[in-house]
Structures are given as C-alpha cells and as structure tokens.
From Swiss-Prot:
Residues at which ATP binds: 34-35, 76, 79-81, 142-144, 185, 195, 232
Residues binding Mg(2+): 80
Organism per entry: Mycolicibacterium gilvum (strain PYR-GCK) (Mycobacterium gilvum (strain PYR-GCK))
Protein name: Holliday junction branch migration complex subunit RuvB
Keyword Protein biosynthesis: no
Renumbered residue ranges of the record's region Head domain (RuvB-H): 269-357
Assembly and oligomerization: Homohexamer. Forms an RuvA(8)-RuvB(12)-Holliday junction (HJ) complex. HJ DNA is sandwiched between 2 RuvA tetramers; dsDNA enters through RuvA and exits via RuvB. An RuvB hexamer assembles on each DNA strand where it exits the tetramer. Each RuvB hexamer is contacted by two RuvA subunits (via domain III) on 2 adjacent RuvB subunits; this complex drives branch migration. In the full resolvosome a probable DNA-RuvA(4)-RuvB(12)-RuvC(2) complex forms which resolves the HJ.
GO biological process: DNA recombination; DNA repair
Alphabetized GO MF terms: ATP binding; ATP hydrolysis activity; four-way junction DNA binding; four-way junction helicase activity
Swiss-Prot/TrEMBL domain comment: Has 3 domains, the large (RuvB-L) and small ATPase (RuvB-S) domains and the C-terminal head (RuvB-H) domain. The head domain binds DNA, while the ATPase domains jointly bind ATP, ADP or are empty depending on the state of the subunit in the translocation cycle. During a single DNA translocation step the structure of each domain remains the same, but their relative positions change.
Family: Belongs to the RuvB family.
Primary localization: cytoplasm
Length: 357
C-alpha cells in the first residue's frame, strides 16, 4: 500500500490533480513538443494505426480525399495527435476548432469557406457542437456545399456556397452523445483504448529522450503503472518526477526516486490520488461499503456530485474499486484491501480484478 494514509482527504481542487487526463493550465506547449509526427512514431493503438494507414494510403493512391474520420475514446490517449498526423501524412493543412466554439451556423460557414482542397478540418469535442452548426455540417460532409441563409422571416433567402473537398476529423470522448445523422456521415470510425503498461513505458522512454531526462527502465515501469493507462498522465508524472530528481537527487530517475517523488505528489501504486482515496475511504468507513448515492458520497468528501461522478468514478470503476448498482455505489473487496482493511462478507462478489491484472 505504500506510505499513504487511509484517511487522506480530497486535498487540492479536482482540476489540479496530477492524474487528470485533461490538459492543465500551461501544459499545452509541453504536450505539443512531445507529440509524435507520423504514424510510425505513434506508440500504441496498433489496430487504429493499421486501419488509418490503409485509409490514408488508399486516398493518396486514388489522388482524392479520404473519408471523414471519427476518433473516439477517453481524454489523453492521442486523438489530437492522430488528427495532426493525418494531416501530415496527407501533406495537407490542418484547421483546428472545437465543438463548443461552433455555436452558430455562421461560425462554421466562415471556417468552411476558407478551406482549400485537401485540407483537414479537426473538430475536437464534436459531440458539443450546436445544432444549427451540426445541421450545416451534414451538407458540407456529404456534398461539399453549404446553404447560407440571408435575412430573416418570410424574406429570408438561402444561398448555396461550394466548399472545397476536405476531410473532417472529429474527436469525442462521448461517442454516444453524437446524433445518429452526424455519426453516420463518418466513413471511418476508430475507438482508442487505454494503454498497457508496456506501451506507456515506451511512451515514457521516448518523452525522456526528447526532454533530455535520464530515466532508468525500472523507473519507467514504476511511472507507467501509476499512469492510469493514459499517455498524457504518464508524461505529466514524468515531468513531476524529473523535478523531484533535480531538486532532491542528482537528476537521474531511478525506481526509488520515482517512487518517492510520486508519493510526494500523492499518486499511489495503482494511480489513485488523494481525491480517489477520499472517495473510497468515505464509501468504506462512513457508509460501510455502500450502497450509497453519488450525491451523498460527494457531500462526504466535500466535492460536487459531478466531480465524483465524472472525474473520480470512471477510473475507480475501471480499476475494480467501485461497482455501480441500482441502489448506489458499492466498494468492492479490492477497494477494502487497497485501503488496508478487511472486506466484509459479501464484498467478494463485486469484482476483484484490477486494472492491469
């Protein structure tokens, strides 16, 4: 269990967690410097890479644009990197926007009108695009044209505008939130899975080389297994461990240095942080293992219900620590054991398989 207290509280705000898969403030430039530039450099997701290579090579051989591409999966797995790689492999320009930024049809029309033939348009969080913009996107994806409405009321007229043939790459963390008509217009859909520890070790070795960090193999394995199967988290933890190694040691990251550093940053051997352990502690100590509703659990740890449900719970469920039941959240036998406690009778049937076991 390491040197963590079972009674750890939630600590820092959820947005400041070292193990959040989302980009944090000021992280964008560093994240960009570590991005792979080609499919050959991209580590992990072998099926997606193979399928994408076929799609892109086929389009290049035909001298046309590939089908529109939808990339789905949890944050931090490389969807934006793949969009950049797609444009690079095609020798095309990449235009970047996001679903929340496209609030009106006019916003999208302006972007589409500036595309040149062969451009790649990347829309991140495409499930959050506003309905008027989405409906305009249908026609652009299918027929490479848009209808722009001029005026209001009975006097309004629709002016058709041609759009240069382009490839849309959409990224989403919630593919189920896409409307059927939008989803059906993507010719190729790829789902990205969490990484295995061995793949994360390769990611870390590559990043260490780029950043000039001396990282031992055992140290890389130590960081990888605490990274929640997510390259972005692995790279962030690598930078935190580097800071520790430079300040408290000689700058070389050994396994012991990695362990000590990650304990300082409250990331335990399974990748749980203070907030995760606070949720498990409340569930086991305050509510006897459950079942308990997420709102009640959130009050117990001093967080918003959405934070517990959307930030903590997905990983705890995936790691086999919490089970969702019709009556509420229940701690599994593995959760009790991780906190150094004896699970009560009946907890053993609620999933004891860990994330990478």
């Amino acid at each position: 269990m390491g040197r963590f207290s079972n009674a750890d509280g939630p600590g820092d705000d959820a947005d400041e967690r070292e193990v959040t898969p989302a980009l944090t403030v000021g992280e964008g430039d560093i994240d960009a410097s570590l991005r792979p530039r080609s499919l050959g450099e991209f580590i992990g997701q072998p099926r997606v890479r193979e399928q994408l290579q076929l799609v892109l090579e086929g389009a290049k051989n035909r001298g046309g644009t590939p089908d529109h591409i939808l990339l789905s999966g949890p944050p931090g797995l490389g969807k934006t990197s793949l969009a950049m790689i797609i444009a690079a492999e095609l020798g095309s320009s990449l235009r970047v926007t996001s679903g929340p930024a496209l609030e009106r049809a006019g916003d999208l029309a302006a972007m589409l009108s500036n595309l040149i033939e062969g451009d790649v348009l990347f829309i991140d969080e495409i499930h959050r695009i506003a309905r008027p913009a989405e409906e305009m996107l249908y026609l652009a994806m299918e027929d490479f044209r848009v209808d722009v409405v001029v005026g209001k009321g009975p006097g309004a007229t629709s002016i058709p505008l041609e759009v240069a043939p382009f490839t849309l790459v959409g990224a989403t963390t919630r593919s189920g939130a896409l409307t059927g008509p939008l989803r059906d217009r993507f010719g190729f859909t790829a789902h990205m899975d969490f990484y295995e520890p061995a793949e994360l070790e390769r990611v870390l070795a590559r990043s260490a080389g780029i950043l000039g960090i001396e990282l031992g193999a055992e140290a890389g394995a130590e960081i990888a297994r605490r990274s929640r199967g997510t390259p972005r988290i692995a790279n962030r933890l690598l930078r935190r461990v580097r800071d520790y190694a430079e300040v408290r040691a000689d700058g070389v990251i050994t396994r012991d240095i990695a362990k000590y550093a990650l304990e300082v940053y409250d990331v335990d051997e399974l990748g749980l942080d203070r907030l995760d352990r606070a949720v498990l502690s409340a569930l086991t100590r305050s509510f006897g293992g459950g079942p308990v509703g997420v709102s009640t659990l959130a009050v117990a740890v001093g967080e918003e219900a959405t934070t517990v449900e959307e930030v903590c719970e997905p990983f705890l469920v995936r790691a086999g620590m919490i089970a969702r039941t019709p009556r509420g959240r229940v701690a599994t036998a593995q959760a009790w054991k991780h906190l150094g406690m004896t699970p009560p009778a009946g907890a053993g049937g609620l999933g004891q398989v860990g994330l990478f076991e």
